[in-house]
Regions:
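A ligand-binding cleft/hinge motif common to bilobed small-molecule-binding domains
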Residues: 1-11, 134-149
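Alpha-helical, coiled-coil/dimerization segments enriched in small aliphatic residues
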Residues: 84-114
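Proline-aspartate-enriched helix->loop->beta-strand connector
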Residues: 1, 15, 119-136
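Short beta-strand and adjacent tight-turn residues that come in two discontinuous sequence segments
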Residues: 19-20, 105, 133
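Extracytoplasmic substrate-binding proteins
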Residues: 4-83, 162-228
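Alpha-helical scaffolding within the catalytic cores
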Residues: 4, 60, 90, 115-122, ...
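Short, structured coil segments at secondary-structure junctions
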Residues: 12-13, 98-99, 153-154
Length: 229
């Protein structure tokens, strides 16, 4: 077990060892724990409250979306865009939380971190409403190759997940997923998740990265990641 592994490491090194959960539901508590350990309770509480506000906002909005209106999202990673993370994994939990549906649930999960490779035929079979691609994927060539027959591609409903300083959904599944909730909710259901995404990104970067993000920098990050008009 993880607890046993932590005990072993602590005994071998003589250094106090803790395990921090990566689940979004536990992340605020994790920051509060770190604040207690490091003596930075005030800063940790500010971060934890942002996370709590984010998760509560998403849960409230998702509850308003009827099952019949939940968008099917293909979340493709890797250079081919065909490595798909399983529903319920920490790599894909942002999709579930904002009220969408993971379009492809691999029958056999062979690699939770990097995703399970599926065929393009499987993608066509589910006909996703929206396609999300990680950085380094086939975003630039999607309209020219085998993906071009998909309705989501033809209608411009494909996007590249922002990735600075880390991916906002996975790779690795870091605290940036908190910002990913705001981004994906606003992208998929803008009438429910109605706010200025640039302002949210600026607040997040100030709190979590101690960086004053300019409007121009935010626009650059979101250039492949916002609704096309």
């Amino acid at each position: 077990s993880i607890a046993k592994d932590m005990d072993t490491i602590q005994k071998q090194t003589g250094i106090p060892t803790i395990f921090i959960e990566a689940d979004l539901d536990d992340m605020a508590a994790a920051y509060r724990t770190l604040g207690d350990i490091l003596g930075r309770q005030e800063q940790a509480e500010e971060l934890a409250q942002f996370i709590d506000r984010t998760v509560t906002m998403a849960q409230t909005n998702a509850a308003k979306i009827p099952e019949s209106q939940r968008l099917k999202v293909l979340f493709g990673t890797g250079s081919t865009g065909l490595a798909c993370n399983a529903a319920g994994s920490v790599q894909a939990d942002v999709i579930d939380l904002v009220g969408a549906v993971n379009a492809i649930i691999p029958e056999e999960v062979t690699n939770r971190g990097g995703g399970t490779t599926v065929s393009l035929e499987e993608v066509y079979a589910v006909e996703p409403d929206v396609i999300l691609l990680s950085s380094g994927g086939p975003y630039d060539t999607l309209t020219e190759g085998d993906w071009a027959g998909l309705t989501a591609v033809q209608q411009g409903r494909y996007y590249e997940i922002p990735g600075l300083p880390y991916d906002w959904m996975s790779s690795p599944p870091s605290v940036n997923r908190v910002l990913g909730i705001w981004w994906l909710g606003n992208l998929l259901y803008p009438q429910l998740y109605d706010y200025d995404m640039t302002a949210v990104a600026q607040e997040y970067y100030r709190l979590f990265w101690h960086y004053d993000l300019s409007a121009e920098e935010a626009a650059g990050m979101l250039s492949r990641s916002t609704l096309r008009t």
